[in-house]
Every structure is written in structure tokens, then in C-alpha cells.
Amino acid sequence: MKMMGYQNQVLRIDLRNQTASVEPLRMDFAEKYVGSKGLAIRYMYEELKPGIDPLGPDNKLFLTTGPLTGTPVPCSGKLSVAAKSPATGTMNDCSIGGHAGIRIKFAGYDMIIFENIAESPCYVIIEDDEVEFVDASDLWGKGSHETEAILAEKYGIEYSIMSIGPAGENMSNMACINSDYYRQAGRGGIGAVMGSKKMKAILIKGTKGVKVPDIKKATDRILEILHDNVLQEDNTFIYDVGTTAFLEACNDGGIMPWKNFSDTTDVQWTEYNGDVLIQHREGKRGCGSCGLGCGNFLKIGDAICEGPEYETISVAGPNAGIRDPYSIVKFNMVADDVGLDTISAGDTIIWAMEMTEKGIHDFGIKFGDGEGMIRLLKEMGNRTGVGADLADGVKIASEKFGGTDFAMQVKGLEYPQYEPRGSWGMSLSYAISDRGACHLRSYA
């Protein structure tokens, strides 16, 4: 049975044999596990055997859409990216903005499943019914920003491009997948899974669209919801300053971490808040099917990024004892390009700062060292120098060097930037979340 809202097709790609096949979507799954996350988790449960190596050929990479993806329904454009996590050893799903999810749906698929490991570095082009495998040897070793720029120039901007940086290639447990330049599937080492498959990038283009039973009625209702519930004065701050607005609320509420969660507020938070950062705005954009458009492009000197979001501001700012906007934006830019999750990479570097200051082990960095954070990001992504000891996260590093008491992680996934002692709901979420310490399983 085909339900409206689904394309009723799954694209299965075998990277080792460079083949692609199309099969019907399991509608019994779609009916019971509504939405991209539910569908991804159910397919993982069905297809991944217990005990498999997350970086081995038996793990699979799932790109999953929901029944509303491709429609104008607000916030329906996100894509779930899922696999067994090398960081936690459990099921892991990430949510990524941009336009990749919509283009997958427009290409005619509800889900894409990548299997096995390519014999050599490659990228995959998906355009409606056509799938092409292309040698990526010339891209291997390049950062995500350069990779996506090269591919966009070669194939055009009609494609969504998902890519990994050196961290994914080197299978860091905190490697992310970038998409459309500045959006990430960040947590749990999802980029390491893509790197383990020797897949540098995925290009997606779709021209088929989606079907809605009564498009006029649906559009009228969507516009009504947007007007009455989204485009209201209480929400316009998101358009103006994005999630930087959370700084004030978190600081006032005593849940913004300072120096590796040793304190919960910073009296000088206005030195790097949204009002300060927005002075450096160069442009804006929104993700597909979003009525607000929170994305801000900032440029300070040679540092440019989309954002930075609250999490990155906190982990590259107060939690590291830093109040310099340039250092925060630079950290964001380099982490994205190297292909590292800003939360996990930042928390791990912050732990190294405390280790050094307490004299347990000298990692050559202390609180307040913004330049040192940039240096370590590059080393972690390439597994060189001190970064080689930090590339797999704070759990593994602390088990080797000590300092487990202040290694902020659950199940191997580093803490997001909400002080759990100031929020019981968030504390519980960190403790019991299926993917480890996660702010998206609570109220955030």
C-alpha cells in the first residue's frame, strides 16, 4: 500500500560493487514509525547485526526523509543520517538541515542506504533514476569547503552536496558530515562511518517533486499556521540573531558552562553575545521548508562561518575560558572544514586544557588559548601530534591519560553546552538518551 507523503522507494547503493537497486519502502515500518528518525532506527534494527564493527563493511549509512519532506510544511526539510556509532557503539541518528533531504525526496526516494566499502575513494552522484560512481582520489585529503566548492563548480548548484573532511577520512570518532557548505550531521562519528566506506561526497539532484492531495488547501493551511504560530514577535529573534539568543537565557538560568562545566555563568557574556556577533554579519539564508531562516553568515578577519550556533559559541567561548568573537568564528570555520563535530571536538580540547592546568598530563594548551584550539582541531582531524591522542574523544583519551572525573561524556558522546546541574530535564536526557549525552532528546 502506498501512503500519500511517501515516494514508496528505497535506493540501495553497494559501494564495493558499484551497483544501485530500488526496492519498495517497508510501509509497515512507515505506518508505525512515523518520521525520518523512526524509519531510520527501524531499518537499522532490521538490518544491522549486534556486535558489528561500526567502521567495518557490515555497518550501513542511512539517509532518511519523512512524509512531509519536500512540502512547504515548516521545519519539514531536515534529513536524518543514521548508522551504528563508532563513538558509542549504539544506534546513532543525526539531523541535518539545508536542502539534501528535499532533493532526495524530489529524486523519488524516501531513503538511501549505503552498504559495504568502496575499493578506492569515490563520490556518488544521484540524479533521479541515475546513479554514478566517480573516482575521488583528487579530493581525498581536502577540506569539506574546498571539496564542495570544486564539486559545485563542476556539476552546478542544483545539487546538494554532502561531504567529509580529513577527520572523516581518518575515521575520528567525532567526525561529521557537511552538507550545502555549512550544515552538519554532527554527532556520534557519523562522518567516520562515511569515511570508512571511502566515500568522500554524495551529490543529490531531484526533479520529480512530491504529490499533495489538495495543494491549494494545504498551502492555505500552511500559510495560516505560519502567520498565526511562527511569524510572531516572540519568534522573530531567531531570524535576527539565530540561536545566539540562547546565550542570555542560558546564562541567566545558570546553565551556560564555564571552563569545562566548573561554573554555570559568565558575568562578561555580553562580550560575545548575539548583539556583538551580528555586527559582523555578511548575509543570511534559511534551510528548505523553513519559515524563519536563522542562518547568519559572519566574517571577522579571515574567519567566516554560517552561525555560529549557541553550542559552538559556548564550546569555543566560555566553556574554554574564551571571550573573543574572532576565536569563536575561526573555531567554527576550521572545525567545519576539517569535518569535526564542534561539540565533541571542543569538549575534548577543553578537557585537555584542564588536564594541563591540573598537571595530570601536558597537552600544550590551557584555558583561554584560542589559537591552541585551532591548532588542535587541525591535528585531531589529521591524527597528527597531540591531536592523535584526542581524535577519538574524551572517553578514550581520559581512559588513557586519566582525568575521567572531569571527562564530560555519556556512553562516549561528549556533553552539549547545557549545564545539567541547572536543568533536571536536561540532566535526565543526558543520562538516558539512546545516543549518549544529547540535548535534542530533551527540551532544547
Where are these regions (language model features)?
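Extended C-terminal regions of large enzymes
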Residues: 152-155, 159-162, 166-188, 194-444
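Protein-protein interaction/assembly regions in multi-subunit complexes
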Residues: 1-236, 240-269
